[in-house]
C-alpha cells in the first residue's frame, strides 16, 4: 500500500441507503434509472480519477443493529450482509483499488437506540457506542472519515481535543449554510426541498403541517466538517446545481441531486482537502453524468 495516501474510512447507515433504494433501478419520469449511492460513486472516483492517488479506502462502517426489529424492517430488502442472488447497495463484486468492497465492511451497531429516548442509561450507551466507533477507526488507521447518511448525531467523537476532531466530514444532500435561501439541514433535507419547489414549507414534520412560501426550485449539497450539531459544521464545498420540478417524486429528486450536486461536492471536497486545487473544476472526470446523458443511456438499455 502507498503510505503517502491518506487513509479514508466511510461511515453510513444501511437503513438510509435502503430508503434511497441504493443499488436498484427506480421509477423515473416514465422510465427507470439506476440509483447509485455516494459510496459506489466514491469507489468509482478512487478507481478511475486522480482522487485514487490521494486516498485509499480502508473501511466502510455501518451502525445498523441486527438485534433491532426496526432496523431489520428498514433493511429487509437487503439484509445486513450480501447474500448471493439478493439485493445489495452496490454491485456485490465491486472492488476498490484492487480490494473487494464487501471485505472492507465493518458493523459497529448503535445498540443504544433500542432504549427509550428518556432512559437513564441511554447517554452512557451512546457514549459506549462512540467509544467503540473510535476504536474501530483507530484500528483501521483512518486519517480522514467521510460520513454519509448516518442517522445518528455524533457528539464525543467530534469534540475538540479528540483524535478525530476536524478529521470527520459529512456529505449532505442539501445546502447547510444558514445564510443561504436554499438551506436544507437535517434528515428531511430532500423532502424539504421538494416542498419548497411547490411553494410550501413544512412547519411540523410530525403532522406535516405546511405554510405557503415563495417557490425555491433549486437545491444542492454541502461537504462540511462535522461538529456535534445537525449539519452545522464549517462548510468546505457547496454545490448548488439541482433544478427541482414541482411534480418530481422524492426518488427522482434524490437521483437528480446525487448526480448534479452531491457527487460533485463529494469529489471537489476531497480534492480540496488533498490540496489538489487543479482538480476542483474537474469533477466531471469522475464520470458524473447529467440527468439528460444518463436518461439517454438508460432509455437505450431498456429499449433493447
Regions found by a protein language model. Name each.
Residues 1-304:
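One-carbon transfer enzymes
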